[in-house]
Amino acid sequence: TYGAKAAVHGKYVLTDKLWAYLQAYAEKHRAAGNGFGFGLVTPEQTARTLSARYYKDGSEILVSRGKNKNPRRLTPRECARLMGFPEDFQIPVSDTQAYRQFGNSVAVPVIREVARIMRPHVLALAEQERTGALQAPLFS
């Protein structure tokens, strides 16, 4: 699932029935003026938000396979990449559980950067508490 010619297992391709349903459902909502729709992207485009419900039908992020071909869902590995997990991260659970877990995750690079910025402040507060310079306890 990496690169332009990467092979993806057929189980990730939407069935004719599901693809027809999603198109009809989107059209019904478009006609009613609602915002429902599926997210169809090419590998070069930015993906939409990955949610924990992705395992149901994958409609938030569908990958185009070209004209007259049903789109496919992301693979769990692609979801891991979107969320910033390293390539060597092992996915020890079923696809369904992996989709839920990655959809509930916060992007790893975001957490890393927040922690990097917070670290000196947390250490300074801890030092103030240790030396008695802190006016009020951090936690009570």
Please place each PLM-identified region on the residue numbering.
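S-adenosyl-L-methionine-dependent DNA methyltransferase catalytic core
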Residues: 1-140
